[in-house]
């Protein structure tokens, strides 16, 4: 069993934060510090993101299982769970499978429905990168710009390189 990277802040009832697709725990650090005034906050890097392990299996049930393993490893019986976007889908899956482990569920920026693919160009851009042969982030940015015109989106993606 592989373990997730996480940041731990504050004291009190546990609040677990799950980031969105292509995000990391960094995205939630500012709010996590604020929430830590009232809760013991765990900000996770989900599988295939940030400093957590990478695996071919990438599904909501697998990620919900990662969350269960994390809670068991940290001796967290029950927690408030906040999930953003993809993290919201993971949180909803987890709450459905393990309702007795969820104190409060907060789902942000996504609903319990299927969505059509809308990251196609982003993934094409990412897959076009020849990572071993890139010499700089600027070079990666120039390649991504062929697929992704928004500077801010590219900078967000480059954080994971």
For each feature predicted by the language model, list its residue ranges.
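The serine-hydrolase catalytic nucleophile loop
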Residues: 20-32
